[in-house]
Amino acid sequence: MKPIILMFIMLTIFMGTMLTMISSHWLLMWVGLEINMLAIIPILMKKISPRSTEAATKYFLTQATASMLLMFSIVINTANSGQWGITNMHNQLTSLVTMAALMMKLGMTPFHFWVPEVTQGISLMSGMLLLTWQKLAPISILLQIFPSMNPNIILLIAILSILVGGWGGLNQTQLRKILAYSSIAHMGWMMAILMYWPSLTMLNLLIYLMLTITLFSVLNINTNTTTLTLSNTWNKTPMITLTILISLLSLGGLPPLTGFLPKWTIIQELTKNSNIMLATIMAIMALLNLYFYMRLIYSTSLTMFPTLNNMKMKWQFQQTKQIFLLSPLVILATLTLPLSPALLTLN
């Protein structure tokens, strides 16, 4: 893809997301979502192959279905209220359909089926864009309409997403699928706290974006896509491999790394609101995610996969991939926990 075309597509994606985030009119918000969806499809198919074509087709069909559901709920809501304002949603049916459409766009349970398959079929950097930037527009809508939604349904979706995100990643060896299931689980954590502290949802989203962008960027340096390729990079780039392992620990939520902050604050806030059982269930289910992160770290640092002797050592090719601002990203993804009092004060 030519750089000028890529720049135009990225600008279109940015404009579509910004249009959705700044709009208070349902029609403009829907148009922004559609611009965003149509513009990212060429990014998903940047490397022409049957797998990327299949992934882009699955993504388009799922997102088009979600867009139809969203437009259906918008039309019904406008017919009942006579207004296009996003906060004028008082019909229970329209709230339920809108929630289903947004959950499908975010890839949350029970509409999570497309996320691992699409992420596995595209490149690492396209997967990074799919699991980070594409979450912003739907979450910005949720932050505006959550008071009109049923809190019990939101909490049920959150618990199921955390469970599926942990359970689905247990037997995976493909790093992109593992990160896809991790994304599903993190979306569940964000939804669980949405009803009680929306600002904490935004902080959780910001930390998730930092961690995921850092991990994808570091994986892209050596083009690591499986556990096998990851385990064979110690001899080529040991510092990069160490950075990957620390980022995985942070994504799993272990102290004293940055990823511990959102889980700690969410569980604390749920406990303050007398949801001790919910906080306990979420903490237990988070162990599933931590298990497959630790399994990745164990297989990478303490074992060597059974390969041919002449394949164990990777050739020392000259490093050609340069990642902009990688060092600050790594620092933010691992060492931000001491700043947590200041971050919570901002909320």
Curated annotation (Swiss-Prot):
The keyword Electron transport applies. Coiled coil: none annotated. Pfam families: NADH_dehy_S2_C, Proton_antipo_M. It is a multi-pass membrane protein. This is NADH-ubiquinone oxidoreductase chain 2. The lineage of its organism: Eukaryota, Metazoa, Chordata, Craniata, Vertebrata. PANTHER family: NADH-UBIQUINONE OXIDOREDUCTASE CHAIN 2. It comes from the Eukaryota. It catalyses: a ubiquinone + NADH + 5 H(+)(in) = a ubiquinol + NAD(+) + 4 H(+)(out). GO terms for biological process: mitochondrial electron transport, NADH to ubiquinone; mitochondrial respiratory chain complex I assembly. The chain crosses the membrane at residues 3-23, 25-45, 59-79, 96-116, 127-147, 150-170, 193-213, 240-260, 274-294, 323-343. Core subunit of the mitochondrial membrane respiratory chain NADH dehydrogenase (Complex I) which catalyzes electron transfer from NADH through the respiratory chain, using ubiquinone as an electron acceptor. Essential for the catalytic activity and assembly of complex I. Its EC number is 7.1.1.2. It comes from Lemur catta. GO terms for cellular component: mitochondrial inner membrane.
